[in-house]
Swiss-Prot record:
It comes from Aquifex aeolicus (strain VF5). Part of the twin-arginine translocation (Tat) system that transports large folded proteins containing a characteristic twin-arginine motif in their signal peptide across membranes. GO terms for cellular component: TAT protein transport complex. This is Sec-independent protein translocase protein TatC. It is a multi-pass membrane protein. Pfam families: TatC. One of its GO terms (molecular function) is proton motive force dependent protein transmembrane transporter activity. Belongs to the TatC family. PANTHER family: SEC-INDEPENDENT PROTEIN TRANSLOCASE PROTEIN TATC, SEC-INDEPENDENT PROTEIN TRANSLOCASE PROTEIN TATC, CHLOROPLASTIC-RELATED. Its main location: membrane. The chain crosses the membrane at residues 15-35, 61-81, 103-123, 152-172, 191-211, 212-232. InterPro entries: Sec-indep_translocase_CS, TatC. Keywords: Cell inner membrane, Cell membrane, Membrane, Protein transport, Translocation, Transmembrane, Transmembrane helix, Transport.
Length: 240
């Protein structure tokens, strides 16, 4: 296919994806206030006395728009992923097509697991520690900006969703021969430190560090295991 045809196809797929995103965001706007109530739950459970306040007349509108865009992207993600698949499908071999779908579904599942883990486990613990530090140690008045709180929640949820993609990324890199399971195994001791540092950045108390580091370490071990399976299968095919 000529380059102009590729660019035309890419443009078409991007337009469809953008339209799906805009439609999804428009639909999500009607449910944004309900999503906001869900996002408020962790802080209300951690510190019921906290009052969420707005700092400008336009802040409530921008908060609803921010939530709508985030939820709209989730709603549109099946369409966006399908357009991505249709764009790259002609360039893939049959065995690559068979491998791509499980990887795609696996990445979606892992992202959702990471987001749910952040919302139900990490967020309440982080809020309890961070707000406790401010309200009890510094004797600060328990008021929080709604916009800053929602931004914090969305960033944390997305960050853990992306972090949970680690097995997929490392599996692909190992399958492509960029890195080996042996290299990952030798890097394990450094990754343990990295996992606990990440936990310390979010909430420096020991129990929260451990709770956040354990899933990352498990995902790392799963990545090594999947890489060993991939390289073993590749060697068997080469021998045959």
């Amino acid at each position: 296919m000529p380059l102009t045809e590729h660019l035309r196809e890419l443009r078409y797929r991007l337009i469809i994806s953008i339209i799906a995103f805009l439609i999804g965001s428009g639909i999500a706007f009607y449910f944004a206030k309900y999503v906001f109530e869900i996002l408020k739950e962790p802080i209300l459970k951690s510190y019921p006395e906290v009052e969420l306040i707005t700092l400008s007349p336009t802040e409530p509108l921008f908060i609803l728009i921010k939530i709508s865009l985030a939820v709209g992207f989730i709603i549109a993600s099946p369409v966006i992923l399908y357009q991505f698949w249709r764009f790259i499908e002609p360039a893939l071999y049959s065995h690559e097509k068979r491998a791509f779908i499980p990887l795609l579904l696996g990445s979606i599942l892992l992202f959702m697991l990471g987001a749910l883990f952040a919302y139900f486990i990490v967020l309440p613990l982080a809020l309890k520690f961070l707000l406790g530090l401010g309200f009890t140690q510094l004797l600060a008045t328990p008021y929080l900006s709604v916009d800053m709180y929602i931004s914090f929640v969305l960033k944390l949820v997305v960050a853990f969703g992306i972090a949970f993609e680690m097995p997929i990324v490392l599996y692909v890199l190992q399958k492509a021969g960029v890195i080996t399971p042996e290299q990952l195994a030798s890097f394990r001791k450094y990754f343990i430190v990295i996992a606990f540092v990440i936990g310390a950045i979010i909430a420096p108390d020991v129990s929260t560090q451990v709770l956040m580091a354990i899933p990352l370490l498990l995902l790392y071990e799963i990545s090594i295991f999947l890489g060993k399976l991939a390289t073993r299968k590749k060697k068997e095919i080469q021998k045959a």
